[in-house]
């Protein structure tokens, strides 16, 4: 249940998100001297009225067209959002499933053994969700997806 996350008061807040697992170590807003403020853009609660008022998305589009960035949408949002709120990890779990996880983000991660490399497993890649991530918590949902997938191709 994510109703607490979704129904929170957004007065004077542009967006709410969870700290990026890896970005919290590498990306910081040095101009505002905030160290742990780099949000992952995979799960965001957006206050569209405030975003229109501050023109955040227009500024983000401009920044992305003017400057090359790693993770351009996420980096620009983090750099330009002036009023953001940090939500608990459980609303965008990017690393490992925990008992309190409400939303798990299937994101690219880093692996260090047997050598440094990135690992990307998409949630619809059922075989790799099982074999690589060793996740079986979503088997009921993945079974439904597998049954419905052929119907999607018909339309």
Set out the residue ranges of the language-model regions.
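Short glycine-/acidic-enriched loop or helix-start segments at secondary-structure transitions
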Residues: 1-4, 27, 55, 114-116
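GT-A fold catalytic core of metal-dependent nucleotide-sugar glycosyltransferases
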Residues: 1-23, 45
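Short low-complexity stretches enriched in small and charged residues
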Residues: 2-3, 34-36, 57-63
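Extracellular/periplasmic catalytic domains that process cell-envelope and extracellular macromolecules
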Residues: 9-10, 37-38, 96-98
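Short, surface-exposed recognition loops and adjoining beta-strand edges that mediate ligand/DNA contacts
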Residues: 23-24, 97
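Short, P/G- and charge-enriched loop/turn segments at secondary-structure junctions
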Residues: 28-34
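A glycosyltransferase accessory/donor-loop signature
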Residues: 41, 46-155
